[in-house]
């Protein structure tokens, strides 16, 4: 697999007062998307970490435009990650003289944006769209009939307890006092 180097720009925000785990939750939403899409997603994301991440992405886009002269319409969030910064430790008093530790975590957020050229029509289609078109074409084509299954053999009638009426014999009628 060959890798192509695209012109890029970097922005970092250090000592951001948000947990790296919470920042990564937001970062995963925008990785690989265009800068405009990423900023739209972050604008409406309910997480508090979306604001500092959006600021860093906007800063990286501004760096690309002003320092490198790149077109903002072609910028894509190529790499974005949150590393752990220093943790400030505080104390929360508890009952009976105890004290629990509060960890105020910080993050270092790094964003790399690249200017990628517009894709041609063929590669612009997603693989999902191509699969859907292929399945539609297969559905329109006349389907080959599968060999017909043999009809199952008829089952023998189930045995039932048939109640037979007692046959009239001369003995039974004589015993009852009947006349012959």
Swiss-Prot record:
The UniProt record lists the keyword DNA repair: no
Listed InterPro entries: Ribosomal_uL22 (IPR001063), Ribosomal_uL22_bac/chlpt-type (IPR005727), Ribosomal_uL22_bac/org-type (IPR047867), Ribosomal_uL22_CS (IPR018260), Ribosomal_uL22_sf (IPR036394)
Entry keyword Ribosomal protein: yes
Region (Disordered): 111-180
Any one GO biological process: translation
An example Gene Ontology molecular-function term: rRNA binding
Alphabetically ordered keywords of this record: Ribonucleoprotein, Ribosomal protein, RNA-binding, rRNA-binding
Pfam families tied to this protein: Ribosomal_L22 (PF00237)
Biased composition (Basic residues): 142-166
Domain of life of the organism encoding this protein: Bacteria
Coiled coil regions in record: none
Family from the record: Belongs to the universal ribosomal protein uL22 family.
NCBIfam families: rplV_bact
Entry protein name: Large ribosomal subunit protein uL22
Organism: Mycolicibacterium paratuberculosis (strain ATCC BAA-968 / K-10) (Mycobacterium paratuberculosis)
Lineage: Bacteria, Bacillati, Actinomycetota, Actinomycetes, Mycobacteriales
Primary gene name: rplV
């Amino acid at each position: 697999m060959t890798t192509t180097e695209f012109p890029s720009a970097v922005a970092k925000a250090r000592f951001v007062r948000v947990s790296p785990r919470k920042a990564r939750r937001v970062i995963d939403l925008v990785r690989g998307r265009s800068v405009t899409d990423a900023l739209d997603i972050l604008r409406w994301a309910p997480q508090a970490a979306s604001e500092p991440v959006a600021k860093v992405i906007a800063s990286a886009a501004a760096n690309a435009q002003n320092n490198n002269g790149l077109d903002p319409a072609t910028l894509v969030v190529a790499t974005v990650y949150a590393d752990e910064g220093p943790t400030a430790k505080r104390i929360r008093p508890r009952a009976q003289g105890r004290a629990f530790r509060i960890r105020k975590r910080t993050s270092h957020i790094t964003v790399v944006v690249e200017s990628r050229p517009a894709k041609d029509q063929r590669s612009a289609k997603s693989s999902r769209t191509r699969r859907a078109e292929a399945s539609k074409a297969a559905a329109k084509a006349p389907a080959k009939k599968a060999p017909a299954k043999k009809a199952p053999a008829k089952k023998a009638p189930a045995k039932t307890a048939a109640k037979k009426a007692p046959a009239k014999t001369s003995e039974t009628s004589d015993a009852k006092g009947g006349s012959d």
